[in-house]
From Swiss-Prot:
<feature type="compositionally biased region" description="Polar residues">
    <location>
        <begin position="564"/>
        <end position="578"/>
    </location>
</feature>
<protein>
    <recommendedName>
        <fullName>pH-response regulator protein palF/RIM8</fullName>
    </recommendedName>
</protein>
<dbReference type="GO" id="GO:0005886">
    <property type="term" value="C:plasma membrane"/>
</dbReference>
<comment type="similarity">
    <text>Belongs to the arrestin family. PalF/RIM8 subfamily.</text>
</comment>
<feature type="compositionally biased region" description="Basic and acidic residues">
    <location>
        <begin position="649"/>
        <end position="660"/>
    </location>
</feature>
<dbReference type="GO" id="GO:0070086">
    <property type="term" value="P:ubiquitin-dependent endocytosis"/>
</dbReference>
<feature type="compositionally biased region" description="Polar residues">
    <location>
        <begin position="791"/>
        <end position="800"/>
    </location>
</feature>
<feature type="compositionally biased region" description="Polar residues">
    <location>
        <begin position="758"/>
        <end position="768"/>
    </location>
</feature>
<dbReference type="InterPro" id="IPR050357">
    <property type="entry name" value="Arrestin_domain-protein"/>
</dbReference>
<dbReference type="GO" id="GO:0005829">
    <property type="term" value="C:cytosol"/>
</dbReference>
<dbReference type="InterPro" id="IPR014752">
    <property type="entry name" value="Arrestin-like_C"/>
</dbReference>
<comment type="function">
    <text>Required for the proteolytic cleavage of the transcription factor RIM101 in response to alkaline ambient pH.</text>
</comment>
<dbReference type="GO" id="GO:0030674">
    <property type="term" value="F:protein-macromolecule adaptor activity"/>
</dbReference>
<feature type="compositionally biased region" description="Basic and acidic residues">
    <location>
        <begin position="235"/>
        <end position="248"/>
    </location>
</feature>
<dbReference type="InterPro" id="IPR011022">
    <property type="entry name" value="Arrestin_C-like"/>
</dbReference>
<feature type="compositionally biased region" description="Basic and acidic residues">
    <location>
        <begin position="726"/>
        <end position="738"/>
    </location>
</feature>
<dbReference type="Pfam" id="PF02752">
    <property type="entry name" value="Arrestin_C"/>
</dbReference>
């Protein structure tokens, strides 16, 4: 018995040891029954951002260890929208791609529980058969639909818009017959902002309300009981609360319609403020006198917000004063751009007409924010193409039952299916300083759109997910917002808390017309600032796109006009020669004229031939040197230099010839240079423009090395290869005069020649003026002069040419003072 028990214990110990070893071996060793080791999708361009209508190519990689039988292998490209009911639901369950409809379809389907299918494109890679051991790659080519609105891919804590490539391998087995692998790709919706116009400007008027002639109701009894006393207090509450509520602007776009309703409700027996629910009901415990005092804050005139100024007869607050228009505050807010791209600046112009002088350092606050909206249980009626069975199934599976009236029965506000959230992206501040003379102020503030934002998302089926960008403009018409911002800074505890407003300027902002106060992550909360008295708020929607066709047309689509097409006829040239001045009077006259009268090519000659469209070309400053229209002929063709063939030469010889081609031309002979020096000695400022003044512009006499150089413009015009030394002095002088006549003036016309005369004398515009008129203005100093400045001043003040016409405040010397020549 003892031996049998010992053998039994030993056998059980051996079985336990074998079992433990088998478990360890299963953990660390590859399973022998596994037939497929690798199954994944490899797209050709995995990091590409696709658009609708693009082709998605790639391959499905499959590695088989043992021969297996398959039913079919398919690959599908599909897009879907999923909204989670809670922020934690994104990590609880994954989306079952098998639930999405199979096949090729471009129709949107709602599958319930916040899941909707956008489209699906399926392709069969392999049919029924047997796969031997090896590595297989099945290529595919899928297409995004081009006629379906596909929103941009996005993943966030409350939902997702995803596009995936799913490969499904089906085997003829009862246990796990399908094997699925997914690969996510990204799509960006093409939102063109080039054709979006700028929104209409919003105008808000604050009209005065006189409280001193307020009428009391006569149907009230003289003694106030409990109910009557409460009614009287309620009436005073209505008056004061309406004034308080109407003195501030609406907080959203939906509340803008309430501004116009404020004036309509004013004439009723029991006026109700459109924003009554936002204020606590604390006015019923105070008296009428204290209520008026607290609401007016020491002032006897209040204001109400309205879209247009007008009188409302029968108002219970009393008759209007005759100076209503004079005491009306008007604020106009205009967004200067209809749309923007990531990284752009969005300018906003604020114009205020006030009744008194105010100065607010932070009077204008512009905030760019993104507003997202999700709906986990959209109405089934928003989806088309659902069968009766699908409608019946979706009504049973709907988490939030809806009644026929649309009120959803008795439910809490937090139990709704819609959620709206806001994310502040950028903020800018600007001062509001009213001019004490005109009582007007105009401020332009630019807000920069961050570069990492995604385009506006709209048009999702059932409005499951939507993202839009809005611009909130807050204007302090009371001048008391600076103290509130400072209190917010003190409560926030500094700039690091994120609630303070730094004084740093936008590093990307250029130009002094726009103001950018805040930059970075320090964005203050404007929710409390909107509720202050005398503060108005206007909201614009800013579409953020991905492309701008208007910029592309401006860069590459516009063609410069042909100068020959604008060439005037010879008969009208003499009568339509433009006169471009350079003096102060001419500058003022040029600024007062419209910019369309002078474009880059000076098309003045075609003004009388017919109407011209608006010019989009660059308009130069009047101080630039203009081209003479009498010289606007056909462009002269300059042939390329005749470079000899140096294929047979050595590398050293080719380098030497290339170096010689970079050197200037050889100077002329000594006798020729001596005669030219006498001709050009007086005109020392036009040396660079003369044809034979310097070595670089002298004609080519000869080249001992035989290296070809490009012919000059003078050679092409005269038709000669070179100007020989045999030409006489008169011929060379004629060439020089022709070049001076065709060249633009070297000096602006505001350069006074020093001739004393009346101030209204026009500047010398002739290009062939003698060189004596351009003499230097430096005085000649001698060693005997102790105080050359005083003698110089006395000399020119006596002649009256110290401040000549067009001198621009600089001393002008007489033309008889030559410039000292340079001597080595």
């Amino acid at each position: 018995m003892g031996g049998s028990s010992a053998s039994r214990n030993q056998s059980s110990l051996l079985e336990d040891t074998h079992t433990s070893r088998s478990l360890i071996s299963r953990l660390f060793s590859r399973s022998k029954t596994r037939h497929i080791t690798d199954f994944h999708i490899r797209p050709v361009d995995p990091h590409r951002k696709y658009a609708k209508g693009d082709h998605v190519t790639g391959a499905v990689v499959l590695t088989v260890l043992r021969p297996i039988r398959i039913t079919h292998l398919t690959v599908a490209l599909h897009g879907f929208v999923k909204v989670f009911k809670s922020p934690n639901a994104a990590h609880e369950a994954t989306i079952n791609t098998a639930q999405i409809a199979s096949g090729v379809t471009n129709r949107t389907r709602y599958l319930g529980n916040g899941l909707a299918s956008l489209f699906q494109d399926e392709q069969v890679l392999s049919a029924d058969g047997k796969l031997e051991a090896g590595r297989y790659e099945f290529n595919f080519d899928l297409v995004f639909p081009s006629k379906v609105n596909l929103p941009t891919s996005i993943d966030f804590e409350r939902g997702t818009i995803s596009y995936m490539i799913s490969a499904t391998l089906t085997r003829p087995t009862s246990i796990t017959p399908t094997t699925v692998c997914d690969r996510k790709i990204y799509l960006v919706e093409k939102v063109d902002i080039g054709s979006i116009p700028a929104p209409r400007p919003r105008t808000i008027s604050l009209e005065p309300i006189s409280r001193r002639t307020r009428r009391r109701r006569t149907d009230r009894p003289s003694t106030l009981g409990g109910a009557d006393r409460g009614s009287s207090l309620g009436d005073s509450h209505d008056v004061t609360s309406s004034d308080l509520d109407s003195s501030r602007a609406p907080e959203s776009v939906a509340a803008e319609s309430n501004i116009a309703n404020d004036a309509a409700f004013e004439g009723q027996q029991a006026p109700q403020s459109p924003t009554r629910t936002e204020m606590p009901d604390v006015m019923s415990e105070v008296s009428t006198e204290s209520a008026i005092t607290s609401s007016s804050a020491g002032a006897s005139v209040g204001y109400k917000v309205s879209e247009a100024t007008g009188s409302s007869s029968g108002s219970q607050f009393g008759a209007r004063t005759p100076t209503v228009e004079e005491k009306t505050i008007t604020a106009s807010v205009e967004m200067l751009k209809g749309g923007c791209l990531p990284g752009d600046f969005v300018p906003v112009k604020i114009s205020v007409h006030h009744i008194k002088r105010i100065k607010s350092v932070h009077g204008v606050i512009v905030t760019l924010y993104r507003q997202g909206r999700i709906d986990s249980a959209p109405p089934i009626s928003s989806f088309q193409g659902l069968s009766k069975e699908d409608v019946r199934r979706l009504e049973k599976e709907e988490y939030f039952p809806r009644s026929k009236t649309g009120l959803s029965g008795l439910s809490l506000s937090s139990a709704g299916s819609c959620s709206v959230f806001r994310k502040d992206l950028s903020q800018a501040f600007g001062p509001l300083i009213i001019d004490p003379i005109t009582l007007d102020a105009s401020v332009t503030i630019s807000v920069r759109v961050p570069e990492d934002v995604f385009p506006t998302i709209k048009g999702v089926p059932g409005e499951l997910i939507s993202f839009k960008y809005q611009m909130e403009v807050i204007v302090d018409l009371g001048g008391k917002l600076a103290s509130q911002i400072s209190s917010v800074q003190s409560k926030a505890g500094g700039i690091s808390a994120g609630g303070a407003m730094p004084s740093a300027r936008n590093p990307y902002e250029s130009g002094g017309s726009s103001i950018m106060g805040s930059w970075g992550n320090s964005i203050i909360d404007t929710d409390q600032l909107r509720r202050h008295k005398g503060v108005i708020s206007v909201v614009f929607e800013v579409p953020v796109g991905s492309v701008d066709s208007s910029r592309q047309r401006t860069r590459g689509g516009s063609l410069r006009p042909n100068p020959q097409a604008r060439q005037p006829s010879q008969a009208t040239e003499s009568s339509q020669i433009p006169t471009v001045g350079y003096g102060p009077e001419d500058k003022q006259r040029a600024q007062s004229e419209p910019a369309g009268q002078e474009d880059y090519v000076h098309s003045h000659g075609s003004q009388g031939n017919g109407p011209m469209g608006p010019s989009t070309e660059y308009v130069p400053s009047p101080y630039y040197t203009p081209h003479d229209p009498r010289q606007q002929h056909a462009p002269i063709y300059i042939p390329p230099p005749d470079v000899p063939n140096d294929m047979g030469l050595s590398e050293k010889e080719r380098a030497r010839r290339a170096e010689q081609r970079l050197l200037p031309s050889q100077p002329p002979a000594a006798p020729f240079a001596s005669t030219l020096s006498e001709t050009t000695l007086e005109d020392i400022y036009n040396v660079e423009d003369d044809a034979a003044a310097g070595p670089s512009s002298a004609p080519i006499v000869g080249n001992s090395n035989g290296v070809a150089t490009a012919p000059t413009l003078d050679e092409v015009e005269s038709g000669e290869a070179a100007v020989g030394n045999s030409e006489d002095k008169l011929e060379r002088e004629r060439h020089r005069l022709l070049q001076e006549a065709s060249a633009p003036p070297d000096f602006p016309e505001d350069y006074d020649t020093g001739d004393p005369g009346p101030s209204n004398q026009g500047p010398v515009t002739s290009a062939t003026a003698p060189a004596l008129s351009f003499q230097p203005s430096a005085p000649i100093l001698s060693e005997d002069d102790e105080d050359p400045g005083s003698s110089y001043f006395n000399q020119h003040t006596s002649t009256g040419d110290y401040m000549g016409a067009g001198a621009l405040g600089r001393p002008i010397t007489a033309p008889h003072e030559p410039l000292p020549r340079y001597q080595r």
